[in-house]
């Protein structure tokens, strides 16, 4: 059986990227919380 994680940069950006996060209210909350927490990286 093959492993389930087969990394692809395009999918990574499309699914977890900044623009995708900004599209939904929940995603904006994620960005906001990560800013407040002081994360170096906000999104993938």
UniProtKB/Swiss-Prot annotation:
Keyword hit for GTP-binding: no
Presence of the UniProt keyword Ribosomal protein in the record: yes
Pfam families associated with the record: Ribosomal_L34
Keywords assigned by UniProt, alphabetized: Ribonucleoprotein, Ribosomal protein
Domain of life per record: Bacteria
GO molecular function: structural constituent of ribosome
GO CC entries: ribonucleoprotein complex; ribosome
GO process annotations (BP): translation
Basic residues: bias regions: 1-23, 30-44
TM annotation in the entry: none
Sequence segments annotated as region (Disordered): 1-44
NCBIfam families hit by this protein: rpmH_bact
Entry-linked HAMAP family: Ribosomal_bL34
Annotated family: Belongs to the bacterial ribosomal protein bL34 family.
Protein name per the record: Large ribosomal subunit protein bL34
């Amino acid at each position: 059986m093959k492993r389930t994680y087969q990394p692809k940069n395009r999918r990574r950006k499309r699914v977890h990227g900044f623009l995708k996060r900004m599209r939904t209210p929940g995603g904006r909350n994620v960005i906001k919380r990560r800013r407040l927490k002081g994360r170096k990286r906000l999104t993938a």
